[in-house]
C-alpha cells in the first residue's frame, strides 16, 4: 500500500482532506508533518512535529521518513480533497506507465487549481464536453513539469529529485533535475479538488522573487527557463 505524505502550516484544510482519505482511500497510511498545536489531534497518522520552514524542506522531511519503509509515496498538498477514485486511479495509471519500462519521475493528478498541463480547464485538443468533462481527461499525458498537489514518486526517483529549500519552484527544480537524469513525468487521469493559496498566499511576484537567489546560486542553468532572463 502506497502511503500519503502531507505537510501543513495552518491545517485549515486538513479536516476535510483527511476525511476524504478516510472515506475514499482508507487503506492508505498517512504521514503528517506540522506543529504540535496543529496536527497533534490526528491520531490515525504518523506525526512529525516541526515548525514550518518552506515547502521543500518540510516535504523532504516527511517524504524521507515515509520512504524509509515504502518503495513509493503520494505527495499531497494539505488543501486538496480526494474523490472516490483519486487514490486508486492514480496508482492504476502508475502501473500502466511502468509497463513502458522507462524511468518514471512524477505522476500527478489533474485538478481545478493547478498548472495548465494538469488543469481540467486545459483543452489543447479542442475536445467537446462529454458527460461534463473533456474526453482528454481520461487519458494519461506526458509532461515536462508536475505540480505535486497529489502526485506519485518512487523511492528511486525521489533520491534523484528531492526538493530544494523553496516554496515556489521547488517542484520545477525537482522535475528539471529528474528530466536531466532521464526520468519522465506524466499527468494522470486521476482528479483531486484543490483550494489553493492557503499557505503561501497569492502574491505571485513576491513568490517568484523569493526563489530567484537560490536558483541563481544552485541551478544557474535553469534561470532563463524558469524566469525568462
What are these regions (language model features)?
Residues 87-105:
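Conserved donor-nucleotide/metal-binding helix-loop-beta segment in metal-dependent transferases, i.e.
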Residues 70-81:
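Short beta-strand-to-loop acidic/aromatic patch adjacent to the donor-nucleotide binding site
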Residues 164-229:
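C-terminal catalytic/acceptor-binding lobe
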Amino acid at each position: 500500500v502506497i502511503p500519503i505524505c502531507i505537510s501543513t502550516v495552518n491545517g485549515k484544510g486538513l479536516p476535510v482532506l483527511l476525511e476524504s482519505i478516510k472515506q475514499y482511500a482508507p487503506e492508505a497510511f498517512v504521514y503528517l508533518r506540522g506543529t504540535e498545536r496543529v496536527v497533534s489531534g490526528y491520531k490515525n497518522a504518523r506525526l512529525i512535529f516541526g515548525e514550518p520552514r518552506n515547502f521543500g524542506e518540510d516535504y523532504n522531511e516527511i517524504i524521507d521518513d515515509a520512504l524509509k519503509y515504502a518503495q513509493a509515496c503520494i505527495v499531497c498538498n494539505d488543501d486538496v480533497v480526494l474523490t472516490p477514485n483519486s487514490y486508486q486511479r492514480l496508482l492504476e495509471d502508475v502501473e500502466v506507465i511502468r509497463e513502458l519500462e522507462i524511468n518514471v519521475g512524477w505522476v500527478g493528478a489533474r485538478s481545478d487549481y493547478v498548472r495548465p498541463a494538469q488543469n481540467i480547464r486545459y483543452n489543447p485538443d479542442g475536445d467537446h464536453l462529454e458527460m461534463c468533462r473533456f474526453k482528454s481527461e481520461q487519458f494519461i499525458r506526458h509532461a515536462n513539469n508536475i505540480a505535486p498537489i497529489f502526485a506519485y514518486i518512487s523511492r528511486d526517483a525521489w533520491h534523484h529529485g528531492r526538493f530544494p529549500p523553496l516554496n515556489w519552484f521547488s517542484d520545477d527544480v525537482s522535475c528539471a533535475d529528474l528530466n536531466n537524469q532521464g526520468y519522465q513525468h506524466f499527468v494522470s487521469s486521476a482528479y483531486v479538488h484543490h483550494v489553493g493559496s492557503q499557505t503561501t498566499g497569492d502574491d505571485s511576484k513576491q513568490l517568484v522573487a523569493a526563489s530567484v537567489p537560490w536558483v541563481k546560486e544552485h541551478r544557474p542553468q535553469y534561470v532563463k527557463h524558469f524566469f525568462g532572463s
